């Protein structure tokens, strides 16, 4: 019982609402796990615990049976130990085959201005190495700009509004559960 501990460093947090799922995969307790992501809850725990977390496009994976937070922004996706396993599990969850060989010369947009000052030294070095390796895989890297001023405020208001509407009754009847 108690809080979930980070699989890499138990003195650190597991990274969010799907942290237990990420830790279970990282420690080999399970081969894969399902997470939900409204604002990073698949990707952040995956990054914190050294596993692969994939947030599929909105609507690709059904949320039937999941307890919603924000119907407009909720996603479900896999946490696995490899990209191949994430691809395979996403196919199962989506109920359709997703061909890998169909991608020719992908282009990666990288918002370097947005990332400036947000990455630690070691993460920045690893990310730079990745960007340098992509052209050898016939991928193009383009610097892009993400004008995100004000987007976060709108996003958080939407999520809070929808969460309040969805959970209003339960919050009134069982506040201790929140």
PLM region spans:
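Short glycine/serine-rich loop segments
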Residues: 1-90, 97
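Amidase signature
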Residues: 92-178
């Amino acid at each position: 019982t108690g809080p979930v501990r980070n699989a890499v460093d138990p003195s650190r947090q597991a990274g969010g609402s799907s942290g237990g799922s990420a830790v279970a995969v990282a420690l080999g307790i399970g081969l894969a796990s399902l997470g939900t992501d409204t604002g990073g809850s698949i990707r952040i725990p995956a990054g914190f615990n050294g596993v692969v977390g994939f947030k599929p496009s909105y609507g690709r994976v059904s949320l039937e049976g999941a307890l919603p937070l924000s119907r407009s922004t909720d996603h479900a996706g896999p946490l696995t130990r490899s990209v191949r396993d994430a691809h395979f599990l996403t196919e199962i969850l989506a109920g359709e085959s997703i061909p890998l060989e169909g991608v020719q010369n992908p282009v990666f947009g990288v918002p370097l201005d947005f990332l400036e000052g947000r990455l630690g030294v070691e993460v920045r070095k690893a990310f730079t190495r990745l960007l340098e390796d992509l052209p050898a895989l016939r991928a193009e890297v383009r610097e892009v700009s993400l004008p995100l001023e004000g987007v976060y405020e709108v996003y958080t208001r939407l999520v809070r509004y929808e969460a309040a509407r969805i959970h209003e009754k339960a919050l009134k009847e069982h506040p201790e559960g929140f």
